[in-house]
């Protein structure tokens, strides 16, 4: 609630310092470009491993969730046949989520990559990423074990239970996790680009129209000073 108030209060302050009133068409143009670039391709992360991992995890999660919703709610009767494309989407989405999420978790997290913290250090804010990876991983294992038709064994039921628990943690731990991060970041990107377009710039000074004088600064080397 504190962050929400701060977000909207900043937006109100920015309106007061705007130098230009954007038309509806201009707003739509800015928002469309933001969705196509900053959100759909996570361009703010630049070209690199972190961006690839985020794109894999993001689109994997979208495919996984959409496939789950369609198969659960649209093909519910015993006589209905689920088109083969939906299980494919579900499995591809789960695999992308596991690959992108694991890449981020083990190698790209700031506290691991730049601060030398161990990968197994977990705080409340990590619940979302961990539960997201594990729910997809357990779902894939459960699906594989079902395909083996293991008569008289309960291996698949064990991973079904783990799959359910991971999803309960994922959605039940929203209060402590970074789940809201998925929605805050796009909203912040749209506000930032609108602020640049109307001249308010979030009350920051404009960029100087002059050549760089101080070199690369913090971009000179990777942040690994521990």
Give residue spans per PLM region.
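Membrane-interface segments at loop-to-transmembrane junctions
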Residues: 18-24, 43-53, 82-89, 113-131, ...
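Hydrophobic alpha-helical segments of integral membrane proteins
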Residues: 24-40, 85-92, 179-187
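Intrinsically disordered cytosolic tails
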Residues: 130, 134, 138-161, 165-226
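Juxtamembrane "helix exit" motif at the C-terminal ends of alpha-helical transmembrane segments
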Residues: 63-83, 108, 138-151
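Juxtamembrane/interfacial segments flanking transmembrane helices
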Residues: 12-13, 106-119, 175-187
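Membrane-interface amphipathic/juxtamembrane segments adjacent to transmembrane helices
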Residues: 7-34, 199
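Hydrophobic membrane-spanning alpha-helices of multi-pass integral membrane proteins
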Residues: 58-66, 92-102, 124-143, 161-169
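Short, small-residue-biased leader/transition segments that mark boundaries at the very start
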Residues: 2-3
